[in-house]
Amino acid sequence: MNPVEDKYVLDVSETETVVQRINEYNEAIKAAAASKNLALADVHGFLNNVKDGVRINGLAVSAKYITGNAFSLDGIHLTPIGNALMANIFISAINSKYGSKIPQVDVAKYRGVKMPDTAPATK
């Protein structure tokens, strides 16, 4: 017995449909960028790599909740480190496509999850 009603969760078939649509959407983006000769940042690939865990300049980054450094406490939005890594994906795509020399962001200058202050207020 599942405590959550079916209308609130995806079953296997629905999950497969979502994955298929994501892949179709990403292919459409890739085709649109190619048709206009534009740089393409592989955000989907980046997020999949983070999901599996990566090491950047000795810093471990993953999608692991709280300790993974990539996602904030809401589990959806990127942390400053996650945003710095994402910026580097865009910078790499631009540099590669256009021969630019935009420097990469130094990820070590950014923080991961900022824990809320749980200390009692003092007077």
Describe the role of every protein-language-model region.
Residues 1-16, 30-77:
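Mobile gating loops/cap/lid regions near enzyme active sites that modulate substrate access
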Residues 3-5, 20, 104, 123:
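Residue-identity detector for glutamine
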Residues 22, 33-37, 51, 90, ...:
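Sec/Tat-exported extracytoplasmic proteins
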Residues 64-117:
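Histidine-centered active-site loop/cap adjacent to the catalytic His
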Residues 118-122:
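Charge-dense, extended regions
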